[in-house]
Amino acid sequence: MARFTLPRDLYHGKGALEALKSFTGKKAMICVGGGSMKRFGFLDRAVGYLKEAGMEVELFEGIEPDPSVETVMRGAEAMLKFEPDWIIAMGGGSPIDAAKAMWIKYEYPEITFEEMCKVFGIPPLRRKAHFCAISSTSGTATEVTAFSIITDYQKGIKYPIADFEITPDVAIVDPDLAETMPKKLVAHTGMDAMTHAIEAYVSTAHCDYTDPLAIFAIRMIQGDLVDSYNGDMSKRDSMHNAQCLAGMAFSNALLGIVHSMAHKTGAAFADYGAHIIHGAANAMYLPKVIAFNAKDPEAKKRYGVIADEMKLGGSNDDEKVKLLIEYLRGMNDALNIPHCIQHYGPDSYPAEQGFVPEEVFLERLPEIAKNAIADACTGSNPRQPSQEELEKLLKCCYYDTEVDF
């Protein structure tokens, strides 16, 4: 038996933020990030709508990119003090992911972070509060998913929390918010969405309910992302819907080792002054993982279907896989995303010499590969890698070399 879970309500289209006026409750806590929602006036509007609905409102501000365990614990403490019956998470993937984890801790104060990370092991929520997610970026789709990513900076590891319990009750997908994204964020979140859709389509957990969502999202992203990056606001609006469809697909079909490796490399070199931004990591690793997974006959066939839907040509599946890989690498070029870790600069742009030294990468490689194999996303990958294979694959992602194994 399989399960397909989405938010009960999804409000979409320009002006959808006004849906907050219709909420019923006594207290709402709004969780936000670094200030863009306040700067562009969306936070004040959200507060006004909730007060119009008769609620007392409190803010938890300053959630950092790649939110930490410590931030989650501070937010949960604030919730325990304020006792909201609505948690409103607003912004990009980071504040929404953090708020999901805070929600768990608010409902179960004794739960540990390690217990939260047990895959599909969260006890029933909604005893104290319901959850609304309002996305301002077009990539993570955490507003409709059963996932949250939290970083343990002491270990340098990003941990996925995965459980249908943390699927939001309400999602608000208002493209007005996405129109404020800076160009680099458009690129990274957009390739995150493309990775979600492609991994969902080839996942071992894909089904008749997820396949149409994944394929349609791929086609939309192909048509919209580069133009959105170059300033076409109608395409920016369309991308906001495309990434949400990709999220619906992967939340139910799950993901694969592109995400496993992105999770485990993202903060692994933070002591060298930067992170490998999640969407950029996905963009770099996706072509390599396609080449690796395509050694599996069923996966190769499904990549061929993706290439057909994208109208890339090719007379057989081997040719189609090659054309798909070439197309995705071309998208990275168009979006100014590097092809490998070796040329990933501290500002995330292509650099002659990246910020991760070769000797440091090789020294940490076995541990990174071990952690990636244990990641929650690995189990649904169409080809299960050994420790040796994943180390070789990560080397290909570092040096941009051919995957021939």
Where are these regions (language model features)?
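Short Gly/Thr/Asp-enriched flexible loops that form oxyanion-binding sites at enzyme active sites
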Residues: 74-76, 95-109, 144-145
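A glycine/threonine-rich phosphate-anchoring loop and its flanking beta-alpha core
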Residues: 107-206, 301-305
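C-terminal charged capping/lid subdomain of soluble metabolic enzymes
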Residues: 307-405
